[in-house]
């Protein structure tokens, strides 16, 4: 039996939507002065961040203009991204973002260890989870000799908005 859609004649079901669950993530952001003062060894740096919005009725597509904006700010392209962490509110939303950005539905560098549908979507920590997951994947790829410099982390943040961050492994 197929899962019941969330609304009449809809396609989003509990089977293709991320679970809203509990979770925790720690992510330390520090400026150069704090890094020096406390003897910290950075693992990555934030290259650029951007937010953007679309009409609220087009829920979930906000990461597209945010991604275009952050790449322009960073002076980079999607081809420069070794890892892309795209938060999946639900499958159709993630596919729409991928297709609008010109990425294949099964691009191996997008959510290589699973996205929110597989891992869950704990509200309030999903952004930190995306950055942490991307950094760990960059480090893993570096250890095995794969290209591992930049990661793009992006998600919709409600009411048509999107946020995107580019990090660089250091």
Which ranges hold each PLM region?
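N-terminal extracellular/periplasmic Venus flytrap/periplasmic-binding protein-like
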Residues: 1-32, 37, 100-103, 107-109, ...
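Phosphate/pyrophosphate-binding loops at sites that engage ATP/ADP/AMP, CoA/4′-phosphopantetheine
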Residues: 35-42, 68-83, 101-105, 142
